[in-house]
Amino acid sequence: MDFFDLDIEIKQERLPAECSLNSPLNISLSSQLTDRMTPQNENIRRQRERIRTHTKTHSRIKHLSKLDNDSTRLHARLTEDLIKLQHLEVDSPVFDNWALLTSYYAALDYTLPERASFDWGQAAPYWNLYTQLRTILLQSQKIRKKDRGVREIYSCGPLRLEFVEGTVLYFTDKQSGGEFTKSGELPSITPYADFLAWVKIISQRAQAVLMAVILRVTDKGLSPLPESLLSVYQTVDDILKRAGQPAIDLLKLWEPLVITKLGELLGDRFGLEEDFRLTIRGEATRLAKKLAITNGLNRLMTVLDSQTEAQPLFQFFGLFKHFAYPRVFSRDTIQAIQEVSDRPSSISAAEFLHDQCEIRKEFYIRYLKAYHRAPGLDLSALSPSSFLRESLEHGKIPNEKSPHYSNKEWYFIKFTKSIEWPISDTLSTFLSDKAITRDRAAWIEEGHSGRDMSEKRLLLKFIKENFSSVAEIVAAADAIYNNEGDRLIALKVKEMELKIKGRGFGLMTFMPRLLQVLRESIAKKTSKLFPEITMTSSDLDMKKRKFMLSKRSDDRRGFIHINKSLDINKFCTSQRQFNSSAVFSSLDEMMGTFPLFSRVHEIFEKTWIVDGSASDPPDLSHFTRILEECRLHGIEAPHVWADGVFSGLKGGIEGLCQYVWTICLLLRVERVMQKTKLTHYILAQGDNVIITIIVPVEIHRDGIISDQESRRLLTLSRNIDLSLESELEKSGLTLKIEETLTSENISIYGKDLHCPQHLTLALKKAASAAIISSEQYQDIPTFLSGLGTSLESLSECVNSKTGAHLFGVLMGVAGWKDLATHQTWRGWRYPYHKAPLSGRVRASDMKIGKGEAVELTIPVMSPRQQGKETLRELLANSLLGSALGMLAFPTPIDLEKRGVGDYITHRLAIARKALLSEKLDPHIEKRVRSACNLPLSSRVDLSKLFDSPFSLNLATEEDATAVIKRQAKKTLRLQEIGNDKLRAQIGNMDKGIAALDADLAGAETINPRLNHMIRDITDEKESEMFVTKFASARTMRTLAMGDSSEVPIVVLLEKKSQQKELYTIWRARRPHATMWKCSTVLAKGLRDISWGKTIVGVTSPSPIEAMETTHIDPTDWEDSRSRETLSINYYLSRAGIDEQTAKLTRGSLVPYYGTQTKPLIAKAYLELKGNPRTNKALLLLSVRESLVKTGSNLDELIMQLCSHALDIDAASLPALRAQEEATAGEGLRGGIKESMSPVGPDNFYTNITHKVFNRKWVTPYHVNIADFIIQGLIETRKHLILNEKMDGLLPLSSVKCTACFRKKEREFFDIPEGPTWKNDSTTSDPAYTYFTTWCDLPRVSTLPTMDQQSATRLLGRGLSLNRPTAGEIITKFYSMSMESQRLLHPVDLLLGYGEGVVFGYIRSQHIHHGALFQTKRETLTNKLRKFILDTKTQHAKQIGYLFQDEDSLHELMAQGLCPYVPRSIPLTITELTNACAITTIRATEVILSAGSRVALMPVQAIDETDVDNSRLAANTMQTILGDSRPMNPVYLDCDLTTNMTAWESSIELDVLKSENFHIDGLLMDLTARELPISDTPWKQRDWTCSNDPRIIAKGIKTKSLFIHQGVAEALNMTPDLLVVIGGGLGGCAVPYLQEWADVPLIFATLFDERERISEDGDLVVPPEILVRGMAPRMIERELLEAELCDVTNDGNRRLLTRLVKKNRGKGTVVLIDEIENRGAPESLLQSSLQDLVRRLDKVCTLTSIHTVRESTVEQFAQRTNSIKRDRKTVTLHWNRYNRRDQFEALVIVKGEETRSDYHVSTATAAQAFRKIDEQLEVEGRLSATRWSLPTLPAREKEILFGYVSSVFLKTNLVLSADDMDRETLLETIEDTAPGLISWKEKLEHRDHAFRSDIDEKGITQDKVFNLICLAWVITGLRYGIWETDAQSIITKTVYITRGPKLCPLGEKPKRVFASFKLQSDKRVEDAKGFLSALLHLEGFFPLGRQ
């Protein structure tokens, strides 16, 4: 039986496209293969030749046309003959093991009828034939090594089969008699797909008959007699044998015929008109006469007419759904049926008009409700006095009862475009929706995914090139509809598989596709008008919603729900009547898109639709030719219109314009429902409409519903059916009878009361077990795998589930065993594999000799023993779930849909029951027991074992308590009730429901399946009962295995047990006591008071407090009245005791609603989740959360917090993200994941399925709620056994702070709701600032109240202590909204950060050495330096944010904050790193030298003294930093500043004019030569900025502040206007403003550019200069807006030009262009700039100054030419701050120069730079004089110090102000440089070391490079000789001598301690940068102190 033993998985090859089962091509294909038609393509021709060779060799047939290829007749004949030859015993091992099966069912309390009571003989022939054919299929697909020339022939009785070249040959032996084929041995041939279709038909018949046989015994009256089925099949074969292919048309009328008969039985329940029956029967008779098979039809009708019961007759539906051709009636039949049922023509003109008007009215009303304003209307056609006009002009809904109202007037109203849809938006929907391609080749080839990005890009390109707006595309609609070439639409099987919306969409020609998507995406814009439509929901969601709807008001008494699910026949086809046009035209009017929607009908009339599974791309001329050829061969339409082409209106093309069709349908249904005046909900999705109606019913006090009411209900339901039908008929829609009839269910209290599932077609479902939808390729695995799900749905149809299960077991043993257990398939192949593929697979056990023809006979009977094993395995699995799992067990319907957790419990309970019954076969028992123990081992995930077959998971967000409550009420129904009063109540309810059921059952022969599930049993106020069914894993395992000590709880769950107890929970009201409030609640209160104001709070919440619990001792809880104790108001007692007695003999306490709160983190998370405004706050939250969850670097306090307060292992605290995943239910089927373990106390999980199985409880009390209750019950039970009185002692935890209780807990404790606070503030949103920053977010630990400064420092400190995974926190920090940080002062944060670094270092030392070494200041400083350098990059980024909020400018200014905010991250990593490192090292030095005590990190909580210490440290730092409030933190480029202090306001604006800064530049003229443009080679630039983290910055970026010095003088003019573009905030403007004091300024920072180069950081001007100094001179404020500053935007350039013209037209204007233009998008920028300059040139005399920096001289020349503006001469301005490692200079283009067409050549530029170099050499070589600093103002000195230290910082050396003198500098470098190498730990506290002690691993090339640079500096400082050849410098070796000390470069010491050399010379550029930076400095002022 086991076919699954191959060890290689083979990829299933797809069949030839022609073999799709539903393809009309099979006939045309076989005609082409047998020479009856010319092959359409090369492949088929070759295939034909190969078949011909085969038949010549083996059958001596030369002419293929002699082969019989009529598969219809052949298969009918074969079926007849083979059935006669079969045994009359069903061949299945199940029957030999009937006893085993009987005992299995007995174990589950089912009785299996005797084997003899089933008439298996009737099922045997089909069953056995099917088994043989299936075996042949399996054998033929098994991979084995094939030798050439060996034939594989399969036999089935006398029939022989051979698979050849994609076809099947059928023949018989000479010996065997019986004419199987026309002439003895002459073979017949059919395509493989036809053979599969035949096997499928046999399989379905076998299953249908088998099911009928079983149901005959288990569910009497449910199914037809097997005899009548067999006679139907026999007649059908006979008909097919006689008439062949055309008879299929007749069989398609089978269902309408069944309907006519049903209509007779059920009266007009179907709403069938008499003439419909006559037409159908007449049509059938006519067809039969035409085909000469009248007798056959009569025999069929006799069988039909003999059926007199509705139920069995119902099963005749769908008997022939499996024919392998499209289910399309012939044209005549369609017309005949349409004339009767679709009758749009029968509607009178008045009715039609009324209809159109109703639709317009509906649109109007919906618009009004959705948008609260009337749509735009054109009322001109209405008379001015019209009543309707008057209402509409006032935007009202007209009163229809008014005598003046006339519905007809709506016809004259036109909508004017009312719904806005921006072009870009529509196009984006359009693009994301579909991939659209013009490439027809892609239609057929495999591998084109529907969502191919490149296709979308092509489309976008196409639109951009051809259309400027959506309107244009719409306008093109006319042409498209009328274009001959666009008339083809193709369907491609693959597309359907991908579920791309609109079945016809896939291969539609290009332009109609464009329209189609455009139409859909525009229609979606109306979604606000049609909330009922859910196009995106899957079937699953639809089911969910339906389920939820029926529960929506389950607690309201006296309401009954009626659910109907409408299914409509040929949905889109039928709607293409003119009636729906009103909807389309209304949409067109509202959208302003005529004729996009209105013409939709036409496209169908004019379209040819081609089956895309055909082998050739559709093509009209080719198509017509083939069509002719087909007609000649007598192949009739519509089956094979050539390549499967059919016309648009003839069905098939579903789904186009789906959304609008849905609107049409919805409006009709809504119209019917409104007339009922009942509460109703509608969900619509295409042709699926679900309607839920809520009907009030009168229920008597004794629970009985009167006859009158039940009759009213039935009439109501039927009337709705009828009116729906007549309304839908107006659109030509017919309801699908079977589906609609069987969908209606009536429920009360959310439970099904009347479910017509018994009408569902059991046989049809059984037979469809093997149905394959046409999209799947026909391989055996797909062929078989349909079984599991079909059986599952089958079990819903059958009342006695034993029948369905028995059927499943039979099928399973027949070969689905593997599917039932593993659900994997291996080693199958398509019979026509390519040889090499088969060759790779090892040979199977069959050896075939060369050249001999071997016939493989397959034994009909299989070995019995093997069958028994299979059966056992199947049954064991079926107990524990998986594919056949659920079938035999009566699972309550809502449990089925509940999800894994309940499902597992349910299975285990069933398994346990079976095990305890002792009736199970021991082998099965053994298997089940071993499986049940699985959860104890970690090897197998429990949920893998219980893989629920229900994909439907309606896990609504309920907590454990709700689940328990729900389950309890269910279980309660099964208890023996002791309380008389209660028992009487329940009895009453039962009586009422039974009466209702009886009434419903009166509906003819329909017997409803009853469900006694009642929601609310007793009055809640009096008492509440519950029993729990769900518990922890421990309890669950107890359920499964009977040997645990905790059995008592299981007893409660057993149905048949005698020892049940019932407990009552009493509730007593307590007097209210004032309770304690935790800091979180106080902080919230504070927040509420200060809402809308910028008050900074004084408390900060503490999670420890919020999670603090009190333990309550039950012995005295009721008497204790003290303030701290909480009262628990529930306790248990035995049933039937009055309250007073219960108090005296009370049982254990049960906190029914669970009294732990969620931990704060989770609480804040849930509060914030989903609110877009507060979502950002979550990011901040997670920063803080990570403080709690880091491990190593935190103190004991946090560890304890995690272990005790949160009841989890700190190391495994999951991120909130995991929690979110869990809530979303991801990974549910994959198993219950570890990540789902709850955050905080266990009641936090939101869904029962997130249970974590192997839990270690921290305390015996801290368990989840279910366990609480169970424990209460178990304790109570123990007490009852030991004592008579119940005095339980179950202590429990409760949260201290009552204000933290949730709503349910408040109810529980009788605590009234506090007054809720409403925000009546008018400000936009400042309150959230405060909320998101401080309130509801936990702090690291409990601190005394702090002012805001200290609090901020704490955060900074936290950041420095927390080492996040690379970039994690950083990213979150940056993506936070700025408003949440608006009140944090950066300086505070930095101070906190500095302090944290010190603390962190000291603590790490403490951890390493067990004690802190008290060393002298120097060594500690050095170590700190190292520590800071190690950690700086990790943390630098976290501080680098600025403030950004235009609205709060004034508020910020008032607080002393700088208003400027760039859009990108403002400072580079390097800069921040430098700033932080310098700041913290300075601060640390001061703290240590001041000798103030720095405490070690505290082990327990932080106390007052620690806080004082940290404040002291911070204040000390403040004095160093000169932080006097208020201050303006302005970030200069950090390369320029020692720390992040601001420019003091007191600085004079003219400081920068001091001598030192007055730098004269060198001016060079560049003259253009006669070098025509074409000769200039345009060099492609690479990305040269230092953004790449792998490149060390190429030296120091020179600052525009210095570069522009002296230019204003050189220009020798005073302009009328200054325009600045680029340059950050334009430091470049400062030198000019100093020179020209009163020139007005236009300031346009190029933000776009800034974002691109932000890694380099730009200069930010002091706010005084900007705000105070420049503001008066600003011309137009709006130019500061980021959007206007982007000159790549044409509008901005125009604006700039206009402003210049307006203010200083014809004057002289200076333009400073500071744009670094060397990146990827340079062409755009360059052309924009050229354009801008050209425009400005026309309106004024323009002098432009451009910063140009390029890496090669060619690029420099190129760039100069691009900005030269046709000037003959441009001037180069160069000064010492320009870089020398690249070609950098200012290019000045003067306004008044003459023009020329020539360009500056590369040679000219090179010469200019050479001159500059020569001049420099002459001006002064770098001398070796003493180090000295010129006298500078202190401020500038600091700037320059900063510059020096930042140069050194690039080599990882931190310098302080003390090091700025020559000797100190030398000493520092010599001593600290070796520290860059990581020596081993033992060297840390020694001052000497050995060479062998160097830890080689720590030495990277970077460090060696840094050493070389520093050694070079030592040489320069010591000897005054500065070598400038970088190439030779980096090749030298650098030595370290004993000490260790660094030696000058080029010197080798006597005792070499270590030496290093660079491995590669790639560092030349870096070295040049470093050297030039220091040389510039040295040239400017000698390093060191005077």
From Swiss-Prot:
Pfam families: Mononeg_mRNAcap, Mononeg_RNA_pol. Residues 560-757 form the RdRp catalytic domain. InterPro entries: Mononeg_mRNAcap (IPR026890), Mononeg_RNA_pol_cat (IPR014023), Mononega_L_MeTrfase (IPR025786). Keywords: ATP-binding, Host cytoplasm, Hydrolase, Methyltransferase, mRNA capping, mRNA processing, Multifunctional enzyme, Nucleotide-binding, Nucleotidyltransferase, RNA-directed RNA polymerase, S-adenosyl-L-methionine, Transferase, Viral RNA replication, Virion. Coiled coil: none annotated. PROSITE patterns: RDRP_SSRNA_NEG_NONSEG, SAM_MT_MNV_L. Its main location: virion. Residues 1592-1788 form the Mononegavirus-type SAM-dependent 2'-O-MTase domain. GO terms for molecular function: ATP binding; GTPase activity; mRNA 5'-cap (guanine-N7-)-methyltransferase activity; RNA-directed RNA polymerase activity. GO terms for cellular component: host cell cytoplasm; virion component. Its EC number is 2.7.7.48, 3.6.1.-, 2.7.7.88, 2.1.1.375. It comes from the Viruses. It catalyses: RNA(n) + a ribonucleoside 5'-triphosphate = RNA(n+1) + diphosphate; a 5'-end (5'-triphosphoguanosine)-adenylyl-adenylyl-cytidylyl-adenosine in mRNA + 2 S-adenosyl-L-methionine = a 5'-end (N(7)-methyl 5'-triphosphoguanosine)-(2'-O-methyladenylyl)-adenylyl-cytidylyl-adenosine in mRNA + 2 S-adenosyl-L-homocysteine + H(+); a 5'-end (5'-triphosphoguanosine)-adenylyl-adenylyl-cytidylyl-adenosine in mRNA + S-adenosyl-L-methionine = a 5'-end (5'-triphosphoguanosine)-(2'-O-methyladenylyl)-adenylyl-cytidylyl-adenosine in mRNA + S-adenosyl-L-homocysteine + H(+); a 5'-end triphospho-adenylyl-adenylyl-cytidylyl-adenosine in mRNA + GDP + H(+) = a 5'-end (5'-triphosphoguanosine)-adenylyl-adenylyl-cytidylyl-adenosine in mRNA + diphosphate. It is found in: Virion; Host cytoplasm. The keyword Methyltransferase applies. May form homodimer. Interacts with the P protein. Belongs to the rhabdoviridae protein L family. RNA-directed RNA polymerase that catalyzes the transcription of viral mRNAs, their capping and polyadenylation. The template is composed of the viral RNA tightly encapsidated by the nucleoprotein (N). The viral polymerase binds to the genomic RNA at the 3' leader promoter, and transcribes subsequently all viral mRNAs with a decreasing efficiency. The first gene is the most transcribed, and the last the least transcribed. The viral phosphoprotein acts as a processivity factor. Capping is concomitant with initiation of mRNA transcription. This is RNA-directed RNA polymerase L. It comes from Hirame rhabdovirus (strain Korea/CA 9703/1997) (HIRRV).
